[in-house]
């Protein structure tokens, strides 16, 4: 892992965009994995800004979302396909049909999940995946206790995740779906590179477990320790419980002189 710790969320977004542009310059038709939630919002805004400035084109890009709720209407504002279109896809030149997400509405959810996993493989795999983290250490909707080798599957959302996400549903946990379709940890690990973003004190325990703890089902994001290309971008609050924070800062500074 390459770990950067910063005071400014705008700087985090800029650095994350820099990494994605590196991939774009090497491969203009790259495959982009997209996360939802609050963590990547500034990154997506920065990518839109750079598109408008002529620094990147999404004309040859295909995207694959990490996850989708089950049980929401297709046009629900908080549906993840709608989130991605609203915050990125509809604001750049990505062609119609190039943005993909898990199907949370099909009659056979498990078959749909397996088909999504195969679609990613058929498209050559994800070149760079954007990731955030839940307060319980989940990535995608891979909750604690699941297998570390899972593929895209139907999952059950924990009470903690539903409480965390209630802020997107007028604070009402009863409006938050109980199920989802999510890329599995094995699917996520197949991505060639990752950009991981975490901000805020509420993520500090999960960040510490992911980086400095053992690899365990209790903290699903810890599996990223086994991936060869993960760029971790944190603010001071999210990094506040890291015992080796000063070391990570020193290494980052020396590598980015």
Describe the role of every protein-language-model region.
Residues 33-37, 65, 102-103, 130-133, ...:
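Short beta-strand segments
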Residues 1-32:
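N-terminal glycine-/serine-/threonine-rich phosphate-binding loop
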Residues 56-129, 246, 251-256:
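Ligand-binding beta-strand-loop-alpha-helix segment within the catalytic cores
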Residues 26-52:
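Glycine-rich N-terminal segment of FAD-binding domains in flavoprotein oxidoreductases
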Residues 136, 140-185:
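Class I SAM-dependent methyltransferase SAM-binding "motif I" and its flanking Rossmann-like core
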Residues 30, 38-39, 43, 119-144:
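A glycine-rich beta-strand to alpha-helix segment
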Residues 186, 190-257:
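ATP/nucleoside-binding phosphotransfer catalytic cores, i.e., glycine-rich phosphate-binding loops
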Residues 46-57, 80-82, 144-154:
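A glycine- and small-aliphatic-rich helix-loop capping segment at beta-alpha/alpha-beta transitions
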């Amino acid at each position: 892992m390459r770990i950067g710790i910063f005071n400014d969320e705008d700087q985090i977004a800029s650095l994350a965009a820099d990494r994605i542009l590196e991939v774009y310059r090497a491969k203009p038709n790259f495959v982009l994995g997209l996360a939802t939630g609050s963590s990547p919002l500034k990154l997506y805004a920065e990518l839109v800004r750079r598109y408008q400035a002529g620094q990147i084109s999404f004309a040859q890009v295909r995207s694959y979302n990490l996850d989708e709720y089950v049980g929401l209407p297709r046009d629900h504002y908080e549906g993840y396909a709608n989130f991605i279109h609203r915050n990125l896809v509809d604001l750049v030149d990505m062609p119609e049909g190039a943005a993909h997400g898990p199907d949370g509405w099909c009659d056979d959810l498990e078959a749909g999940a397996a088909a999504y996993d195969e679609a990613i493989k058929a498209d050559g795999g994800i070149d760079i995946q954007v990731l955030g983290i839940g307060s319980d250490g989940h990535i995608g909707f891979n909750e604690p206790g699941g297998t570390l080798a899972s593929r895209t599957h139907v999952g059950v959302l924990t009470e903690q995740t539903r409480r965390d996400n209630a802020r997107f549903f007028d604070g009402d946990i009863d409006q938050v779906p109980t199920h989802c379709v999510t890329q599995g940890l094995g699917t996520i690990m197949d991505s060639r590179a990752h950009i991981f973003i975490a901000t805020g004190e509420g993520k500090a325990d999960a960040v510490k477990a992911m980086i400095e703890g053992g690899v365990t089902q209790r903290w699903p994001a810890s599996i990223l320790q086994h991936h060869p290309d993960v760029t971790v971008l944190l603010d001071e609050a999210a990094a506040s419980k890291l015992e080796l924070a000063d070391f990570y800062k020193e290494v980052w500074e020396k590598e980015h002189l």
